[in-house]
Amino acid sequence: MAAAQQLARVGHHIVVLEKNDRIGGLLRYGIPDFKMEKIHIDRRVKQMEEESVVFKTNQNVGENVKPDDLINEYDAVILAGGAEWPRDLPIPGRELDGVHFAMDFLPLQNKVVAGDKFEDQIMATNKHVVVIGGGDTGSDCVGTSNRHGAASISQFELMPQPPESENKLLAWPYWPLKMRTSSSHEEGCDRDWSIATKSFVDDGNGKVKELIASKVKWEDGKMKEIPGSEFKLKADLVLLAMGFISPQQKILDLFNVEKDQRGNAKADTEGESSYATSKNKVFAAGDMRRGQSLVVWAIREGRQCARSVDEFLMGKTTLPR
């Protein structure tokens, strides 16, 4: 959307394709309403429509949209999808009912808030919830579970507990390593660090009833289980929120673009062909190019990519970098 608006403002005809039934991607379906109300997305979409941007929903590349058709019909194509390939936890019991990816849980809740109805909605009501993963997505699972009325909520993180404040001499230019407590955590949650989940236990009917985990310690960047630290924890609902590996590979493969070592679309951010992929006329920005990251990075890269596309099409550009 950031790239689309910039390009529309310098006179290009822009079409935005969205695979879901509403515009907004991960902003709409990945972030809970208590964290970001969707009125902000709706307002921006309306603004962009008045600037002549065309939005099309239910457009799924590889299903009802062919990459070759896009390349032939348009002068440039920007791949700007989110990093949606979640990191899995391949341990015994992973297949049990009640063990879900966070991104199977959160989007459903957002759709319900928007007025949709589902027969098989994943609910945390009166359940003992365990969230595996200590990042922002895990925090969103905690907040959503609290709003469902969970019986208990525990959140596990594999890495050690960070310090209360960062080391100022070592932080820049990296993301400061320090303890972070969100409003979701403050609403109620038991948090623990250096925890490795070993298996999920079947209740005899194909549903998870508890998990088995242990404490670990880290030495020289390697994880070691602490002998005698194994424990069991009741769990009716387990949410896997351990980050994302890369964008969905299907789209990148269909466009036949070169990838980097992490499975993202390979494209430089500097030089004459910045944000251009190995495929002529095809550009990539945001999570599709850099992997899992923050909304602000997606906006920045979208705006920079728009400049590169404008220069590619017109031979020059007045868009800011």
Map each language-model feature to its residues.
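Redox-cofactor binding/interface segments in oxidoreductases and associated redox assembly factors
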Residues: 79-80, 101, 131, 240
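FAD-site-proximal beta/loop scaffold in flavoenzymes
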Residues: 95-126, 219-292
